[in-house]
From Swiss-Prot:
CDD domains: Ribosomal_uL14. GO terms for biological process: translation. It holds the Pfam family Ribosomal_L14. The lineage of its organism: Eukaryota, Viridiplantae, Streptophyta, Embryophyta, Tracheophyta. NCBIfam families: rplN_bact. The keyword RNA-binding applies. One of its GO terms (molecular function) is structural constituent of ribosome. Keywords: Chloroplast, Plastid, Ribonucleoprotein, Ribosomal protein, RNA-binding, rRNA-binding. This is Large ribosomal subunit protein uL14c. One of its GO terms (cellular component) is cytosolic large ribosomal subunit. Belongs to the universal ribosomal protein uL14 family. SMART domains: Ribosomal_L14. Binds to 23S rRNA. It comes from Zea mays (Maize). InterPro entries: Ribosomal_uL14, Ribosomal_uL14_bac-type, Ribosomal_uL14_CS, Ribosomal_uL14_sf.
Amino acid sequence: MIQPQTLLNVADNSGARKLMCIRVIGAAGNQRYARIGDVIIAVIKDAVPQMPLERSEVIRAVIVRTRKEFKGDDGIIIRYDDNAAVIIDQKGNPKGTRVFGAVAEELRELNLTKIVSLAPEVL
């Protein structure tokens, strides 16, 4: 579960390395926590030099992995090793051209198929 002030890894090659969540906007209803597939507003805390994204820039991101376990529709419980997000633009397209690490199958059901197609493994 991701809430404001949570630090996340960036799972794409957009140039950012670490994000800090500042607002949960894509959760169902008026929830305080973001889960896999939810959209957040975050600030970049660490970035690669000479890349388009810079430190302290405010961006949108979608959660692709969380340490908090979740139960899939088929009853399987999945927990990842880190909290990770993929940076997206206003239309929901990923800014990077690659996604690192596994992503959840539930992203496909949430119409985030571009992120799923870039991922090397879908669980």
